[in-house]
Amino acid sequence: MAIIKEAVVATFPDLVRVIQNGADRIELNADLAAGGITPSKGMIAEAIQYVHDHDKEITVMIRPRGGNFVYNDIELKIMEADILETQQLGADGVAFGALTDENTLDEDAMENLIAAAGGMTITMHMAFDALDHEEQLHTIDWLTDHGVERILTHGGDLATPIDANINHLKELLAHAANHIGILPGGITSANYETIAKTLTVYQVHGTKIVD
């Protein structure tokens, strides 16, 4: 099975470059220095048109700010509105995540956001990596039960090399048991084939996934 290379971009020139260099799917962000936040409506619209013209798929990041993933009611309203707008513009999918002050999945918030995203694929983004191990396993089950398609994870702190997180990623994959996709993040063009083979996954994600 061919490996799906999901490239993270935040500018239109980068979008064009990664499509030309073999990206299969796009995750569109703004402000990667902040870890990626929701792009502008204009950027989303132009990116969707370009990606679809090239017969690829696009997921849009829904995140109102950098920092943690604990959101107040107003921020959650913003996220819901951004999801609905992204849906109207024709995106294939959205990526989001919300946690509680106790560092657990904010299930109430996630239910509302998932409902708003009807008709699009949903990715739980790297907020997942902020959870402890037991909560990650519970979250995999909860997301599976609520129709989320995949979970983006580095398997540990983003500063750690992916090789150091292989065993943890294998545990997550075993627990997911193919009921939900585990999308390894922080992967590069230099290591994606090795990582995909080691983990037996068919999709990988990163800002440097294509040259």
What residue spans do the PLM features occupy?
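N-terminal entry module detector
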Residues: 1-32
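Hydrophobic faces of well-ordered beta-strands that scaffold small-molecule active sites
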Residues: 3-7, 26-28, 56-62, 94-96, ...
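Catalytic cores of alpha/beta
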Residues: 10-21, 60, 67-85, 129-146, ...
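Active-site-adjacent beta->alpha loops and helix N-cap segments on the catalytic face
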Residues: 12-16, 32-57, 73-76, 99-118, ...
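Glycine-rich phosphate-binding active-site loops on the catalytic face of alpha/beta enzymes
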Residues: 24-37, 85-102, 146-161, 187, ...
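A short, flexible beta-alpha/helix-coil linker loop
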Residues: 32-33, 65-67
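Active-site pocket-lining/capping segments in soluble small-molecule metabolic enzymes
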Residues: 45, 101-104, 109-112, 123, ...
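Helix C-cap/helix->beta junction micro-motif
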Residues: 54, 89, 117-120, 146, ...
